[in-house]
Design a protein with these regions (language model features):
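Positively charged, helix-rich recognition surfaces that bind polyanionic ligands
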Residues: 1-189
Length: 189
């Protein structure tokens, strides 16, 4: 059986409004406007790490996580429908690292790849551009004065000697946005 359908031509947005996003485990998406999506998912990662793989509860929770991530991505795109999106190019992220075993167990459920894939799919259907930039030092750089000091980030808070006090993920999203604004030719999809 074959289906034939007509696909509308998507008109690219002509204005240059952009939003930067920082992807994380505690907040799935933090944007440069100070909005957060998916704060509740870290609890799901914890519960998944404690469930026996293959059990009914594990599979149900995994399905819930996948559906929740899709729901959050759709909400984020709807909230920023008139903006191009600048995100981190996280192609080299490893789930196994020098963290404690318990942290590695939670990180394996982090859905960054699902988020990027979903936003890429939505970018094609909704007509916005997805720009991927190098994530190096975005969470350590002050979005106000540009100082790169690792000690300025204390968990989820960012404090700089210039007087800036901001959520660390919002600070990183602002830095990601700036990289995308100054390098518009980087890896557009």
């Amino acid at each position: 059986m074959n289906f034939i359908y007509e696909k509308e031509d998507i008109k690219k947005k002509s204005d240059n409004k952009k939003v930067g996003i920082d992807l994380g485990a505690h907040k799935l998406i933090a944007d440069s406007n100070g909005n957060f999506y998916g704060k509740d998912l870290y609890d799901v990662y914890n519960r998944l790490a404690n469930k026996k793989r293959g059990s009914k509860k594990y599979k149900k929770l995994l399905t819930y996580k996948k559906n929740r991530v899709n729901e959050l991505c759709n909400k984020f795109v709807e909230d920023n429908i008139d903006c191009d999106i600048v995100c981190e190019n996280l192609k080299n992220v490893k789930h196994k690292s020098s963290f404690y075993k318990s942290v590695n167990n939670k990180l394996q459920y982090w859905s960054y790849r699902q988020v990027i894939d979903k936003i890429e799919t939505l970018s094609e259907s909704k007509g916005f551009t997805l720009i991927k930039v190098d994530p190096s030092y975005t969470s350590q750089t002050c979005s106000n004065c540009g100082a790169v000091i690792k000690a300025n980030r204390d968990g989820e808070h960012y404090h700089c000697s210039c007087g800036l006090e901001i959520d660390a993920d919002t600070n990183a999203a602002i830095n990601i946005l700036r990289r995308g604004a100054y390098c518009p030719s980087l890896q557009k999809t």
